[in-house]
Amino acid sequence: MPAGGRAGSLKDPDVAELFFKDDPEKLFSDLREIGHGSFGAVYFARDVRNSEVVAIKKMSYSGKQSNEKWQDIIKEVRFLQKLRHPNTIQYRGCYLREHTAWLVMEYCLGSASDLLEVHKKPLQEVEIAAVTHGALQGLAYLHSHNMIHRDVKAGNILLSEPGLVKLGDFGSASIMAPANSFVGTPYWMAPEVILAMDEGQYDGKVDVWSLGITCIELAERKPPLFNMNAMSALYHIAQNESPVLQSGHWSEYFRNFVDSCLQKIPQDRPTSEVLLKHRFVLRERPPTVIMDLIQRTKDAVRELDNLQYRKMKKILFQEAPNGPGAEAPEEEEEAEPYMHRAGTLTSLESSHSVPSMSISASSQSSSVNSLADASDNEEEEEEEEEEEEEEEGPEAREMAMMQEGEHTVTSHSSIIHRLPGSDNLYDDPYQPEITPSPLQPPAAPAPTSTTSSARRRAYCRNRDHFATIRTASLVSRQIQEHEQDSALREQLSGYKRMRRQHQKQLLALESRLRGEREEHSARLQRELEAQRAGFGAEAEKLARRHQAIGEKEARAAQAEERKFQQHILGQQKKELAALLEAQKRTYKLRKEQLKEELQENPSTPKREKAEWLLRQKEQLQQCQAEEEAGLLRRQRQYFELQCRQYKRKMLLARHSLDQDLLREDLNKKQTQKDLECALLLRQHEATRELELRQLQAVQRTRAELTRLQHQTELGNQLEYNKRREQELRQKHAAQVRQQPKSLKVRAGQRPPGLPLPIPGALGPPNTGTPIEQQPCSPGQEAVLDQRMLGEEEEAVGERRILGKEGATLEPKQQRILGEESGAPSPSPQKHGSLVDEEVWGLPEEIEELRVPSLVPQERSIVGQEEAGTWSLWGKEDESLLDEEFELGWVQGPALTPVPEEEEEEEEGAPIGTPRDPGDGCPSPDIPPEPPPTHLRPCPASQLPGLLSHGLLAGLSFAVGSSSGLLPLLLLLLLPLLAAQGGGGLQAALLALEVGLVGLGASYLLLCTALHLPSSLFLLLAQGTALGAVLGLSWRRGLMGVPLGLGAAWLLAWPGLALPLVAMAAGGRWVRQQGPRVRRGISRLWLRVLLRLSPMAFRALQGCGAVGDRGLFALYPKTNKDGFRSRLPVPGPRRRNPRTTQHPLALLARVWVLCKGWNWRLARASQGLASHLPPWAIHTLASWGLLRGERPTRIPRLLPRSQRQLGPPASRQPLPGTLAGRRSRTRQSRALPPWR
């Protein structure tokens, strides 16, 4: 069904297929209520189609929290549909009628708790093993399918007619494992289930814990902590150790099985599959043990109901002649206890044992409206019958009740079908024989019509019988207890709702705070991203500006380079033209000169003249060509040189520009990083403040919810105390009514053999007048009896109920507890009466209230005076209590000792198989343990210690004369020290064995394996033994051992006068200078250890070579003003200025001086090299004395104060450039010197 659907809606096909469409009232007949629980009621019914007997569980889903109830019903139906195992209850179907779900299952005779109810004794161990084996098989089936029962207890372990053990009541079960909900019955809950809401999930091992508690319940008739409030039991289960079997009569297999089931850590607890292989459940046992137990229980139930029937008939027929007078209500009240005594539990709250008091949502939600919605027609019929009975008189009403019980008795062996035509109740052959007693008249004078009508109504109600192991009084008592315990279930459900509400409130608060944190982080992230985006935009803008500057500078440099080259080329052209012009003029002049020379010599032939002139011209042209070529070569070299120089200047200028731009970029980035860091720090502070506020809000909410929870728990505890007081009043009033009238007459008589009561001590105050002689009216007598038997025992009952919880309450809470109880706490004068009245209870209660069994917390707080002062047990009270308990019985103000046989007869003890001490029951032949006497501890004798010290000193003196006996002294010293430490003879023998084994193993290792000489091994053994003896004697404070050794060695050497004097002087020096030497050695040792590897240091530290005292001495700042840090911080070492310098300190000073001189020499050589000529620098570099310094590529950042965020400063134009071609000038930079 979807979460938002209506309860009872079948629109969802998956939900609709879970329920049958038929009308259950037409399919099932003879519905009779056979049990009650927190879920509602269980009815016996018969299927009209095949006459099969079934059990119907009616669960209402109307009223408050109807959706939750509907979901729980769907969950249980789905769970039951999946079960297919002989050890689980069989599912027959589920029907819907008038907002009530009819869950039909197979019918079982009863539960394991019914066995305890009927027999009033624990089960035998073989019976517990059989029941546990069947339950384990069912749990193993559930756990193998990832299912958890979560409510395993004796009340949910059912027994069928064939003797099968079946698991029932799956209202708290979980289909998915692991689970994390707080579900189950408090006393059977596992610790992980109790802590599931706070700590995490659990699995099927919680059923193993519940099974262990169920074993204790079957062995002791009640689970552990059963006398405690349910809420208090939850805290004890979660915090205390696991419970164990109290009696010592059980076998070791059973004890081991229970201990295995009750392992506190779930990982150590075995699974159900593993427990099926345990010897406790696999031991041989009779195959019919369950059948025999069922048959014996049926016989006991028959005897109980027959006894109840005889008592009721005797009372009714004896009082019948008096008519419906004033004595009838009184007799009804006297008959009422018999109805309850037949099936009364000895525990304080029987409602926890029989009905399923689950804390699941289904059980809580269906516990209130189950009766009203399930049996409207039956209630109308019962009202009509009650009106008729009121008209007919009390005799007819009691007779109808009696015959109802009779009909229930007669049908325990088989299912009987009676003919509808028979209208006589005694025509049934299975009715018990009722022999008339001598006191019974042959015919009752009551009207015949009244008796016959009552019989007819009883027959109509019980015309068909059914097999069961539950008495009629038990069923009626369960109905009454269900009505009484509805407040408790509502209290538990309210507590669970409060826990759920608190958890939802915390989850809502955490989700809201998580949303605030996410919103805060998103806002901070947006702010950071916006700032980073702004920084990115600024960086891109700066990069574009730098790129524009670089491109502009590059274009300008290229233009200037082209102009520079054109200028040089123009000059070179002019030089070449001038050269060519000069060559022409020179050629003409030379040509004229040659012609003149030829004319001066006319004898030369003309041809020769022409040839000579031609040669001269060629030579001249060749010279001119060479000169022109040389000029061109020089011009080219000059052009290349000038170009290289100009490019170098331009590159240096570009490099300086790039450095300026890069410096500006880095400064900008550093500024942005500083701003981002400041923003992150501010955001971190804001986030930390927000988290601190949220943590404070969460802590305040948790504290408020915890306070509300504690207030609710305290209110529940006070309400529980009030309810227990009311129950105790009713119980004591019933006990007073059950006592013979002779006891009331002898109430003031003193039993023989008791001393007179001491005024102001235990017991009621003595006024000097006998109780018989004191005038009192019948009403005052009843009030006196109620006060003596009711109010005085309420305080003891409250003290027993509270237990350790009451002892651990604060005085303010105890004062509130006393005020809320409605009656003032008893004064110290009433302690005797408290104990007296409590002794006259049941045997289990008497054993629990023995004074020696009280813990100091329970014994210290007894009551509270009206003025608010607390009274404590005194020594006089304890002595009086001890004296009274030693007598075997105590004085009671209104009761006398009743024999145990009479009590059993009045209580209607069942006739069954007797129990023996082997079953876990206390033997009646064993007398009760006397209270322990408080003896003053006597002082321990010092003689054994003196003897051991003297023996060790003597052995040391004897061994000192011969060093070869040192290993023997060690072997003797080890067992003596072990025995002296409290181990006894066993420890001494173990120490001697260890010493011998160690000596033998060392001999085998050293002499046999390593071939060590025997003399060397003996010397090594003597040294080791000497060190061990001295160490052991020093550790155990046996100073006689080293003194004996030293004395023996001194006496063995006669000439020891001078050595003794030297030793005395050395001892004086050691006493004076010893601490300083020890500190120095310790510091040196620690410094050596600290230079080791971490693994070696850790190993030595584990061996004890490093101590905290030495570390604190080495690092004094870690132990400043009493504060010891875990991180050693080296502090300044305080030195005495008068002491001489350490040699290492002098070497360090020399090293510092050498480094200073080296640095000065390097600076001087660098300055000298800057002033040397180039050839000298090249010569020294070729020799290897100098080397060139490479300029770094990392720009030098300016300090924060000198940073300029604006554009770089204007630069002067480079030398050699035109001044008028740029609008801004640029400063020239000097070239760095050559290194």
Swiss-Prot record:
Region (Disordered), start-end ranges: 318-457, 732-777, 804-835, 891-939, 1198-1235
Keyword flag Mitochondrion: no
Biased composition (Low complexity): 350-374
Species annotation: Homo sapiens
Any single Gene Ontology cellular-component annotation: dendritic growth cone
Entry keyword Membrane: yes
Catalytically driven reaction(s): L-seryl-[protein] + ATP = O-phospho-L-seryl-[protein] + ADP + H(+); L-threonyl-[protein] + ATP = O-phospho-L-threonyl-[protein] + ADP + H(+)
Activity regulation (UniProt): Selectively inhibited by the enantiopure organoruthenium inhibitor 9E1. Activated following arsenic trioxide (As(2)O(3)) treatment.
Gene: TAOK2
Residues carrying Phosphoserine: S9, S181, S414, S656, S777, S825, S827
Sequence positions that bind ATP: I34, G35, H36, G37, S38, F39, G40, A41, V42, K57
Tissue occurrence: Ubiquitously expressed, with a higher level of expression in testis and brain.
Biased composition (Acidic residues): 375-393, 899-908
Entry PTM: Isoforms 1 and 2 are autophosphorylated.
Gene3D superfamilies with a match to the protein in the record: Phosphorylase Kinase, domain 1, Transferase(Phosphotransferase) domain 1
EC main group: transferase
TM ranges: 965-985, 987-1007, 1012-1032, 1043-1063, 1166-1186
Keywords: ATP-binding, Cell projection, Coiled coil, Cytoplasm, Cytoplasmic vesicle, Cytoskeleton, Kinase, Magnesium, Membrane, Nucleotide-binding, Nucleus, Phosphoprotein, Serine/threonine-protein kinase, Transferase, Transmembrane, Transmembrane helix
Outcome of swapping K57A: Loss of kinase activity. In isoform 1, excluded from the nucleus. No effect on microtubule-binding
Protein EC: 2.7.11.1
Gene Ontology terms: biological process: actin cytoskeleton organization; apoptotic process; axonogenesis; basal dendrite arborization; basal dendrite morphogenesis; cell migration; DNA damage response; focal adhesion assembly
Membrane topology: Multi-pass membrane protein
The protein's name in its UniProt record: Serine/threonine-protein kinase TAO2
Top-level taxon of origin: Eukaryota
